[in-house]
Amino acid sequence: MGAEEEEEPASAVGREGGGGGGGARAAGAGAGGDTADDDDSGESAAAVVPCSICLDAVVAGGGDRSTARLQCGHEFHLDCIGSAFNAKGVMQCPNCRQIERGNWLYANGSRPSQDVSNDDWGHDEDFYDANQPETSRSVFLPFRFQWCPIGRLAQLPSVFDEGESAPPVTFHDFMGQNFTSEHLPVSAPGATPPGPYIAYFQPLQSSASSSSSHVTERTMDGTTYHDHWNPLPGPSDGRPLATVHPIDFHHNHWTHLPNSYSQPNSNNGVAEQMAIPVVPMRVGGLDSDSQQRGSLPSVYGNGSGSRSRIPSVPPMAPQFMRPHGNINEQYQQNSSSLYAAPQRRTAVQAVQDSMNFTLFPQAPTGPNSMETEDAGGNQFYAWERDRFAPYPLMPVDSEANWWGSTPQSHGVTDHSAAPGRRLFGQWIGAGRSPPPPPPPPADNSSYRQMHIPRM
């Protein structure tokens, strides 16, 4: 009676192993023979089935290796079936291809993290979109990681692509200056207003400069405007400058200003611009075979004299400033671009009290500075007392007017007899305090209160 009870599980195991092929059936037959031998001896033996993965015997109910029985009834070594599941990525029986559902557990009921299958998470629509392709799903989905599409990141360089104007240009030989223009255009026209261009200056060593070179620093914050005057030395023989390649400057705060264009000056070769245009303003850098010279929008002209003067060119100055000295010899008057003194008289008086300046006499700086014959009581320096970074020292001709529209307090000056004075800037480095003003000389000196309007 006990032998018959032993045969039934053995034959059942043989049928279960039949899905694995002939080897399983042979193992079932062998199991039956062993059972017959056990019947003769009267001892029970454990059923043995082969593992279709490693082809080793799977001892049911004991043995050195852990076993796993799937829902379909097939038994495998635990490490073998685990490797098969990991290789396929799905809990599928290698024999009957049936998909298992549930979680793998050890015999003691513990559930290790390495035995967790993503098949449980693959059918959970809470963690990913139903339209998401299968190739994008990974083991990170159970942890609710969101995949960032690379398509949008690849479009980032298009924001910085140049649509209409040239790439940023750097001019390395502005007689001691390094002018760089950078811009941030928008990728789609009309989507957003164009952003401002960024322009800055860096000092460079120049061997062709005959006078001290200086650098500008401009700060723009909303309606606040601040400039350091930047003189750019030019040719000394009166030759006109080479062709200027314009660089666009966009700024939304200046769209209310009138339009103007640069007018070449046959006397000193400076392209002066007295107002900032409505649409992109153009500041020129130029190319030449022998040497490179450049000019920015000029506010103050150069006085006429027997020798050619080095142009003093501040960048992007306010529209209402007028040059001083002999106007007829400094630039060519144009009614469409340059504005006469009576047209700017109201604007100067309206903002006259917004900024304070103090004038003090010039101190001699050596042979490399401006002409020594210009030094003395006829020349003063302007120093800003504003809350922003100070303006550099600028010599101002006491014989001529600071503004072209204000009446002269010292009478009419003969510019043909005395050379006109030039405005000259002084570089103030970062972290250094401005030099103290020198005491005024005893002869022909006074302090004057000046006002520079602020935009």
Curated annotation (Swiss-Prot):
Gene3D superfamilies: Zinc/RING finger domain, C3HC4 (zinc finger)
SMART domains listed in its UniProt record: RING (SM00184)
ZnF segments: RING-type: 51-97
An annotated GO BP: protein ubiquitination
EC number of the protein: 2.3.2.27
Pro residues: compositionally biased ranges: 433-442
First-tier enzyme category under EC: transferase
Alphabetical list of PROSITE patterns matching this protein: ZF_RING_2
Pathway: Protein modification; protein ubiquitination
GO cellular component: nucleus
Subcellular location: Nucleus
Chief location category: nucleus
Ranges that cross the membrane: none
UniProt biased composition (Gly residues): 15-33
PANTHER family: E3 UBIQUITIN-PROTEIN LIGASE IPI1, OS09G0511500 PROTEIN
Subunit structure: Interacts with SPL14/IPA1.
Function comment: Functions as an E3 ligase that promotes polyubiquitination of SPL14/IPA1 for subsequent proteasomal degradation. Regulates plant architecture by modulating SPL14/IPA1 abundance. Promotes the degradation of SPL14/IPA1 in panicles, while it stabilizes SPL14/IPA1 in shoot apices. Ubiquitinates the SPL14/IPA1-mediated complex with 'Lys-48'-linked polyubiquitin in panicles and 'Lys-63'-linked polyubiquitin chains in the shoot apex.
Protein name per UniProt: E3 ubiquitin-protein ligase IPI1
Organism listed in the record: Oryza sativa subsp. japonica (Rice)
Gene it is expressed from: IPI1
